[in-house]
Amino acid sequence: MSTKEEMLDKLFNPRTVAVVGATPKEGKVGNTILKNLLASGTGLLSIYAVNPRYDRIQGLKCYPSLSEIQGDIDLAVIAIPAEGVPNVLEQCAERGVENVVVISAGFKEVGREGAVLESELIKIAKEHKLNIVGPNCLGIINTHANLNATFGKTVPDKGSIAFLSQSGAFALAVIDWAKVARVGFSKIVSLGNKAVLDECHFLEYLDKDPDTAVVAMYLEDVSEGSRFMRVVREVSRTKPVVVMKSGMTEAGAKAASSHTGSIAGSVEAYRAAFAQAGIVEATSIQELFDFSLTLSRIQRIKGGIAIVTNSGGPGVMAADAIEESGLELTAFERETMEKLHPLQLANSYNPIDVRGDATTDKFGTALSIVAEDGYVGAIIAILSPTAPIEFDKAGNYVMAINAKKPVIPVFMGGETVMSAVEELKKHGIANYFDPVRAVKSLKAVKDYEERQKRVFEPPPHFNVDTGQIREQLRHKLGFELLKAYGIPIPAYGKAETADEALDIADKIGYPVAMKILSPDIIHKTDVGCVKLNVNREAVKESFFEIMRRGEKLTTARRIEGVLVQQMIAGGKEVIIGMKRDRHFGPLLMFGLGGIYVEVFRDVSFRIAPLSMSDAKEMIKNVRAYRILHGVRGEPMSDIDSLVNVLLRFSQLCVEFPDILEADLNPIKVFEYGKGCYVVDFKMISTNSVF
């Protein structure tokens, strides 16, 4: 292990712990933390209470400061008012205490003064290389070392799920809920303000933690977007990462000036980043742990889904959910159908209904037969509490068959099923109570499996002279910028007079398109500053009309002329855009283009740089993909050319961080083999709009 990993290992497996702010007063944070540590068992050699007001607490000698303690201290837990924390951190540095949990609140979360105090904390940590969890956090738990360094009252069971939470209150609620649900954890970390240690530090540690099979996270933001994606990609090679992210709506977000800016926001950036990094996203506490529990025992489904039920209604619910989720309700092999026939079922095709009067053995036999089918990758076993069913016996069937093929039990009911449910939990098998929950959990497995296939593909690189391009960017030669990256554009020229417009049009050939060039006029079509299918006789008049309209909208000095462009007729219109996200960098968008992009909002998002798979997925994820693929006898569009533009534009956005927003709209794509053209574009850089 690296030095950082060794330090974090000591954080989770300390031999000696000091509680700064320990107190005999019941209900106080320092009292609860000390009690929890004392109740942790024999894992700790020494526990030190630190508080200058007392001589003894909980039978322990109480020290006035860390400096008075003889011997090593592996971990200090600080629970005192915020203003006293910097002084204690200096004591930690003097005593060689590398790992610190700052429970104390009153830092950046309370405003300006707290932010200054947190800056001081960070400065001390950097100067002395301290690992600090928090501040403003619940603490940490390592169930496999019997360590509970939190002020929570509930101790979770041991398990293989690590849980990182940015909210201490959320973590407390989850721990309490998990105790009732019998969900076990390996490690729990309340991240707090993430002043020093953030989610990435713990993800890197948990990647190598033998006690952890799955990482579940509750996040409000990420510290460094690109680093977060890089770390999660590495972790998710072997361990699923399930994230519940709060704030995933954009109500009240301000409209930005470009099409992309008005649609894209942090929600889209997070969702794109999660998909690209291999994260399985959950939208509720229930999903967070349903998905985590399922992924802790199933990470691949080798085939379609089978349903075996003793009740038609729940079976139909499961079948509907499977279709809606994009999973496959598999067709059985002929041999399976023949084996099922003697059981006299309501039906012997998928989903199998063994009927409400079926015995447990009949249900178990059907399960066993289906499990032998080569087309079946997982089975959803649904049981309602009918009179003939013995749930404990049914649970034994599930456990036996699960050893050969994944079985997802849906034992529906309350008190009647609880004995069997508890026994299943002891063997690491969760019950889902609701067929839809079971299907969603299998979809999470499939999503994880699919993302494993492509999450590690490196982005392609195109050779471009960026030095020359920067000079063109300075002179606002935007089309030249696209051209340099190999992005196809129509022939064009910039005209400052009507005669120049005619000369350019003669060279290009007719008809032509003509558009105003002004940083103040963004949506040119809306204000009549675009002329299409212009023939030779109309070039000069079109020039004058465009200029007149433009001068009504802005000053003459802000009009740079008129763009005269080869007229590209036909094709289907799409848009490629970019907005630079403050967490993740360039957020790319693809969708249905033209003037209706904001009406239909048929778009998909990814973070640059894109891999080939990312680019293809962006196109496939929009509803209009069927149109691009060809419908009602229409030829398929040249999707490969759009993939090429996405990849080249992705590299452009990465290499030019001063471009804040961009729209390539419309892009006209033609039938397969005939390519595409960027007909119009807009870019907003740190210094200009063009």
Which ranges hold each PLM region?
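ATP-dependent carboxylate activation and anion-phosphoryl transfer catalytic cores
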Residues: 265, 278-281, 392, 396-397, ...
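Gly-rich Lys/Arg/Thr-decorated short loops/hinges at beta-loop-alpha junctions or inter-strand turns
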Residues: 14-18, 72-73, 101-102, 155-158, ...
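General beta-strand structural signal in soluble alpha/beta enzymes
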Residues: 49-50, 100-102, 126, 131-136, ...
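Short glycine-cluster motifs
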Residues: 153-208, 254-255, 300-377, 381-384, ...
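Peripheral docking tails and interdomain loops at the edges
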Residues: 97, 106-145, 149-157, 246-314, ...
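Rossmann-fold NAD(P) dinucleotide-binding segment
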Residues: 66-70, 83-106, 392-399
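ATP-grasp fold ATP-binding core
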Residues: 303-306, 471-495, 504-529, 533, ...
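Hydrophobic, well-ordered beta-alpha structural blocks that scaffold small-molecule cofactor pockets
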Residues: 1-44, 49
